[in-house]
Amino acid sequence: MGAAASRRRALRSEAMSSVAAKVRAARAFGEYLSQSHPENRNGADHLLADAYSGHEGSPEMQPAPHNKRRLSLVSNGRYEGSISDEAVSGKTATEGPQPRVYTISREPALLPGSEAEAIELAVVKGRRQRERHPHHHSQPLRASPGSSREDISRPCQSWAGSRQGSKECPGCAKLVPGPSPRAFGLEQPPLPEASGRHKKLERMYSVDGVSDDVPIRTWFPKENPFSFQTATTTMQAISVFRGYAERKRRKRENDSASVIQRNFRKHLRMVGSRRVKAQTFAERRERSFSRSWSDPTPMKADTSHDSRDSSDLQSSHCTLDEACEDLDWDTEKGLEATACDTEGFLPPKVMLISSKVPKAEYIPTIIRRDDPSIIPILYDHEHATFEDILEEIEKKLNIYHKGAKIWKMLIFCQGGPGHLYLLKNKVATFAKVEKEEDMIHFWKRLSRLMSKVNPEPNVIHIMGCYILGNPNGEKLFQNLRTLMTPYKVTFESPLELSAQGKQMIETYFDFRLYRLWKSRQHSKLLDFDDVL
């Protein structure tokens, strides 16, 4: 990048020095004109303005938009350019001074000898004959070759005579008039090569860059197209690389920001500050009705018969069921109260442990030693059924104390936000506990094993997974509470690192042994038996 910038600065300074040399040459020649021609009083400022003299006064004498003048360059002995016509209708040669065309050459005779790169302006005075024609834009202008050569070569010869030892003026060369719709074409053969004492005019117009159709409007030197293109290409490549690097950096920042935001949202869900209000399945079904394609089409009830009879039958049936349930409830409550009225009775705490939990076989060894009311039950996750689990719970309760019911229960299994992985291919979600019959039957029978004499609601703790990490977890707990009515049961699933989690762990486990087991739960380097 530094090399390209220094190259551009060098090219710019060289262009400025070349322009300054041309300006000094033009001013020197203007002074020469002011001395040799008394009518030129303004020196260098009047040099290029004489071409428009006599045309500024009358608006009808303004040149047509297609008429252009050219400043031709003489470089390395080659003369390129043409004198365009200026179509002026009704203007004679005697009205006002004739326009002058100045050609830039490299002859140093008129300039000081110390100026190596001097540039002189050769004055070519021409008198053009124009034809008056109403359609001058479409008709070509015609002039005799002899008169054109005679008019142009006369001042050139007089000026060339005043120059000491200069080469022949390019305007005196052989002119080949080629009439065109727009201009006179002055085509000249190339002059012989200049002597070796003249350096080539650098950084002027490129031969390929100027065509005959496009006029040369300025003699300001242009930059070297090759080096300029190289610098431009380099800058473009640098800008493309910078844009690519900027996009990569912005993408990395966005990715890191999204990860931070996702972790923060997860943290907020875990601490419970963004707890979404629970929405039951019935409320969700009321808002949006959706049914499976295999469900039968709902039919409107036939209202031809009297519906009062059917409603009376249903109400009477519900009344009988409620009466039976109330009788059973009172009977079971009395039996449980009689069983628990003994001295030294401790309400049982049941631990239901899934074999899917890593190192679950060591969990019964880390429970509290000072609390005999804790009943651990380890079941096979792969082969056990809901009936097997319920029978094992009833058997353990009868062994502990006949007629005792569960006051507190811990379900230690795998799962995730919003679901419980109780058995193989049996995942408890808020929707499945309402649809699957075996799951509904399991939770209803489990509710009958809960205590009826407990003045506080019975508690079921969930460990091994964080159910409330998802709003569906709250929906699952709400549906389970609905299934287990009329028994008062609450579900809790606190984080283990929180204060509620520590209290839950201390209810069932020896806290020191539990932390030791937790640290070795996923380790294969040390057997837990050696630690115990």
From Swiss-Prot:
Feature: compositional bias, Polar residues: 155-164
Chain positions with Phosphoserine modification:
206, 292, 294
Q: Which residues belong to the signal peptide in this entry?
A: none
Q: Where is the composition biased (Basic and acidic residues)?
A: 38-48, 302-311
Annotated GO biological processes are: cellular response to amino acid stimulus; cellular response to electrical stimulus; cellular response to gonadotropin stimulus; positive regulation of neuron migration; postsynapse to nucleus signaling pathway; regulation of dendrite morphogenesis; regulation of neuron apoptotic process; regulation of neuronal synaptic plasticity
For this UniProt record, the keywords arranged alphabetically read as follows: Cell membrane, Cell projection, Cytoplasm, Cytoskeleton, Lipoprotein, Membrane, Myristate, Nucleus, Phosphoprotein, Synapse, Synaptosome
Q: What coarse category fits the chief subcellular location reported for this protein? A: nucleus
List every stretch annotated Necessary and sufficient to elicit dendritic processes and synaptic contacts: 2-235
> Where is the protein found, in the record's own terms?
Nucleus; Nucleus envelope; Nucleus membrane; Nucleus matrix
Q: Enumerate the residue ranges of region (Disordered).
A: 34-67, 127-174, 275-315
Tissue-wise expression:
Expressed in the radiatum and pyramidale strata of the hippocampus (at protein level). Strongly expressed in the brain. Expressed in the sensory and motor cortex, hippocampus, olfactory bulb, thalamus and amygdala. In the olfactory bulb expressed in the granular cell layer, mitral cell layer and the glomerular layer. In the hippocampus highly expressed in the regions associated with neuronal cell types as CA1, CA2, CA3 and granule cells of the dentate gyrus. All isoforms have been detected in the molecular layers of the hippocampus.
In this chain, composition skew of type Basic residues spans: 127-139
Disulphide bonds in the chain:
none
**Topology in the membrane?**
Peripheral membrane protein
Among the GO molecular function terms of this UniProt record, one is: calcium-dependent protein binding
Additional note from the record: NSMF mRNAs expressed in the hippocampus exhibit a prominent dendritic localization which is mediated by a dendritic targeting element (DTE) residing in the 3'-untranslated region (3'UTR). Transport from dendrites to the nucleus is induced by NMDA receptor activation and results in a rapid stripping of synaptic contacts and a reduction of dendritic complexity.
Q: How does it assemble?
A: Interacts with KPNA1; the interaction occurs in a calcium-independent manner after synaptic NMDA receptor stimulation and is required for nuclear import of NSMF but is competed by CABP1. Interacts (via the central NLS-containing motif region) with CABP1 (via EF-hands 1 and 2); the interaction occurs in a calcium-dependent manner after synaptic NMDA receptor stimulation and prevents the nuclear import of NSMF. Cannot be competed by calmodulin.
By sequence similarity, the record places it as follows: Belongs to the NSMF family.
Q: What is this protein called?
A: NMDA receptor synaptonuclear signaling and neuronal migration factor
What is the taxonomic lineage of the source species? Eukaryota, Metazoa, Chordata, Craniata, Vertebrata
Gene that this polypeptide is encoded by: Nsmf
